[in-house]
C-alpha cells in the first residue's frame, strides 16, 4: 500500500507560539460550516473579480486561484450568524466535533503532505436563510 510522510512542523510552530499568523479564522480555530442547500456563485465571477474594488474585498487570489468572500461569520458563544451578501443571514449553532479533523495541504509536485491545522468545532446551519430588513 502506498504511503507518504506527513510534515507536522507547521502545526508544531503554531502550537508553540500564539503570535504566529495561522489559518485560524475564528477564536475557536478553523471551523467547518455545515449548511442546508447550496451557495450559488455568480456565473461571471471572473469578470466581477476584475472589477472588484479594494474597499469591497469580495474577491482575492491565492496560489493562482480566485477566492470569493461570500459572507461574514459572527460567533457569540454557542451561537453563530452568517451574513451572506447584504440580503440574507443564517442562524446556526457551534458544536464540538466528536473527533478532531486535521487540515492537510497536499503538494503533488514533491509528493509531500503538511499538517496545517486541526479543526475541533463546526457550525451547523439547519434552517433556511432569513432576509435582512
Swiss-Prot record:
Keywords annotated in UniProt: Cell cycle, DNA replication, DNA-binding, Nucleus
Principal localisation: nucleus
Subcellular location: Nucleus
A single cellular component GO annotation: Ctf18 RFC-like complex
Pfam families on file: Ctf8
GO biological process, one term: maintenance of DNA trinucleotide repeats
GO terms assigned for molecular function: DNA binding
UniProt keyword Nucleus present: yes
Matches recorded under InterPro entries: Ctf8
The keyword Nucleus is annotated on this UniProt entry: yes
Biological role stated in the UniProt entry: Essential for the fidelity of chromosome transmission. Required for the DNA replication block checkpoint. Component of the RFC-like complex CTF18-RFC which is required for efficient establishment of chromosome cohesion during S-phase and may load or unload POL30/PCNA. During a clamp loading circle, the RFC:clamp complex binds to DNA and the recognition of the double-stranded/single-stranded junction stimulates ATP hydrolysis by RFC. The complex presumably provides bipartite ATP sites in which one subunit supplies a catalytic site for hydrolysis of ATP bound to the neighboring subunit.
Assembly behavior: Component of the CTF18-RFC complex, which consists of CTF18, CTF8, DSCC1, RFC2, RFC3, RFC4 and RFC5.
Family: Belongs to the CTF8 family.
Name recorded for this polypeptide: Chromosome transmission fidelity protein 8
Lineage: Eukaryota, Fungi, Dikarya, Ascomycota, Saccharomycotina
Gene name of the encoded protein: CTF8
Amino acid at each position: 500500500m502506498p504511503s507518504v510522510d506527513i510534515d507536522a512542523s507547521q502545526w508544531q510552530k503554531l502550537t508553540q507560539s500564539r503570535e504566529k499568523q495561522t489559518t485560524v479564522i475564528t477564536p475557536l480555530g478553523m471551523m467547518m460550516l455545515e449548511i442546508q442547500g447550496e451557495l450559488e456563485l455568480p456565473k461571471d465571477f471572473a469578470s466581477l473579480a476584475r472589477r472588484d474594488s479594494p474597499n469591497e474585498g469580495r474577491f482575492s487570489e491565492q496560489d493562482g486561484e480566485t477566492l470569493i468572500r461570500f459572507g461574514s461569520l459572527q460567533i457569540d458563544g454557542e451561537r453563530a450568524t452568517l451574513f451572506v451578501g447584504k440580503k440574507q443571514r443564517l442562524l446556526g449553532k457551534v458544536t464540538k466535533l466528536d473527533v478532531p479533523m486535521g487540515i492537510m495541504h497536499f503538494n503533488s509536485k514533491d509528493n509531500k503532505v503538511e499538517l496545517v491545522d486541526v479543526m475541533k468545532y463546526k457550525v451547523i446551519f439547519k434552517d433556511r436563510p432569513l432576509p435582512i430588513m
